[in-house]
């Protein structure tokens, strides 16, 4: 008889191992699994473990040439999701050797590459990943991190202020540079290329880089503060992207930008390495994230995309506002904000954190709050995000009735007033409106901004609930 039993057998016989003790070097994943009717949860969980590691649909002869015990993913726990019918959290442990060192691309190809189209599952969502130090140590991570950035910019004890230049498409390079100058001159720390500003017929990248650099140096000379503009280096090829970053470095600017999901993790990691080697800060935009993370029961939660970015590398990343026009529930948002900034984050299911994450010495990333925010939100933003954050007001700067520079002044005055009030021990959550009103008495720019946006609200229920 042949020492090999052909045929199709249940995944759970091999891949469901409730007695497994997870190792410190394992990558752990929490999946929200919705099995098809009639598929038992253990089989569904085991199928996820199998299809995202060593398994295939039938027994194969070559299984005998390797050690499944050493290389297979294992579903080691399953729990029903409270309040949902036929939905489970399946916990899967992957041996470290399944992954190429320093490659977020390979990590995702393995863990989420194939299994999401699996027929036995109705839907599947990757809720969280535990990255062991043994793996995170193979990544460079953010080019510089929070402390180094503060030292480069010489700005301490407050959030940083930014503004996305609008209208995002259609301005000529010179007019674009003019808007950059006005915002920086008025008191912002940064201005930003929109995520879809790359190199279009109405404004080629090199012209934009030159005019923005000119704007930056002029504003720096006049204010005595260090200024930055996120020059978007995202391009159609990796070579072109690096070429743009090189030109930014030659201009002597402090920071470039990348769209990490549309650009891809391979390109992003290359750019992050270039930025560390050449002293450039790297601002990351998450364009396309909602395609992946917005559905509650299928896709990948943003906290996983945020962890992946910290490994791939970026110094800033957009992470929702909690108060503006885009998705983000407070506790869950603060959960992944901590995952971006802190060294050690405790498991806390109420904030959507399924695993304790120890980043050891990987630098942190500044969360960027951007999208539909204005001066009245400033106390809440200061309270929610604290000092280590970038607050970005696009329309909330450029929409000021007196123009861009007064819009920037209004935001800077509001921010400084909130920081001062907080440092004096006042309660921003309770007295926020009062603090802004007081400041607007001596700042006509702020008073005008307060008048324009006093009624604006984006009130819809958040989708991202636990």
Curated annotation (Swiss-Prot):
Cofactor binding annotation: Binds 1 Mg(2+) ion per subunit.
Subcellular location: Plastid, Chloroplast
Record-marked site positions (Transition state stabilizer): 325
GO terms (BP aspect): photorespiration; reductive pentose-phosphate cycle
CDD domains: RuBisCO_large_I (cd08212)
Cofactor requirement: Mg(2+)
Record text on subunit structure and interactions: Heterohexadecamer of 8 large chains and 8 small chains; disulfide-linked. The disulfide link is formed within the large subunit homodimers.
Name the UniProt record assigns to this protein: Ribulose bisphosphate carboxylase large chain
Lineage of source species: Eukaryota, Viridiplantae, Streptophyta, Embryophyta, Tracheophyta
Gene designation: rbcL
């Amino acid at each position: 008889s042949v020492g090999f039993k052909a045929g199709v057998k249940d995944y759970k016989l091999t891949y469901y191992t409730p007695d497994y003790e997870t190792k410190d070097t394992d990558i752990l994943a929490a999946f929200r699994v919705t099995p098809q009717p009639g598929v038992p949860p253990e089989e569904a969980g085991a199928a996820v473990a199998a299809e995202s590691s060593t398994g295939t649909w039938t027994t194969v002869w070559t299984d005998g040439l390797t050690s499944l015990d050493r290389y297979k993913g294992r579903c080691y726990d399953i729990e029903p999701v409270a309040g949902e019918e036929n939905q489970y959290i399946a916990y899967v442990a992957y041996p470290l050797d399944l992954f190429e060192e320093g490659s977020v691309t390979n990590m995702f190809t393995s863990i989420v590459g194939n299994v999401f189209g699996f027929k036995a599952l109705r839907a599947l969502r990757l809720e969280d990943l535990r990255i062991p130090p043994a793996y995170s140590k193979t990544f460079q991570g953010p080019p510089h991190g929070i402390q180094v950035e503060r030292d480069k910019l010489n700005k301490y004890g407050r959030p940083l202020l930014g503004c996305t230049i609008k209208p995002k498409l259609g301005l000529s390079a010179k007019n674009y540079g003019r808007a950059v100058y006005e915002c920086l001159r008025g008191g912002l720390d940064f201005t930003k290329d929109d995520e879809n500003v790359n190199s279009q017929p109405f404004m080629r990248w090199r012209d934009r880089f030159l005019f923005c650099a000119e704007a930056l140096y002029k504003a720096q000379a006049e204010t005595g503060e260090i200024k930055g503009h996120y020059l978007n280096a995202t391009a159609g090829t990796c070579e072109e992207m690096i070429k743009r970053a090189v030109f930014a470095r030659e201009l002597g600017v402090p920071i470039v930008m990348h769209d990490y999901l549309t650009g891809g993790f391979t390109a992003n990691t290359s750019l992050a390495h270039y930025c560390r080697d050449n002293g450039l800060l790297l601002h990351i935009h998450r364009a396309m994230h909602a395609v992946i993370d917005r559905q509650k029961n299928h896709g990948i939660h943003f906290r996983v995309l945020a962890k992946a970015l910290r490994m791939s590398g970026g110094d800033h990343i957009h992470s929702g506002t909690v108060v503006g026009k885009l998705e983000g529930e407070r506790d869950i948002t603060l959960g992944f904000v901590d995952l971006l900034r802190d060294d050690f984050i405790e498991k806390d299911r109420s904030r959507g954190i399924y695993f304790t994450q120890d980043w050891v010495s990987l630098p942190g990333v500044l969360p960027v709050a951007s999208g539909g925010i204005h001066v009245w939100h400033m106390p809440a933003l200061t309270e929610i995000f604290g000092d280590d954050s970038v607050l970005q007001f696009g329309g909330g700067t450029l929409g000021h009735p007196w123009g861009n520079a007064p819009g920037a002044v209004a935001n800077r005055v509001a921010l400084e007033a909130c920081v001062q009030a907080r440092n004096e021990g006042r309660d921003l959550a309770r007295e926020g409106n009062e603090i802004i009103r007081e400041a607007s008495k001596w700042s006509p720019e702020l008073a005008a901004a307060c008048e324009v946006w006093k009624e604006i609200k984006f009130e819809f229920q958040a989708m991202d609930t636990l």
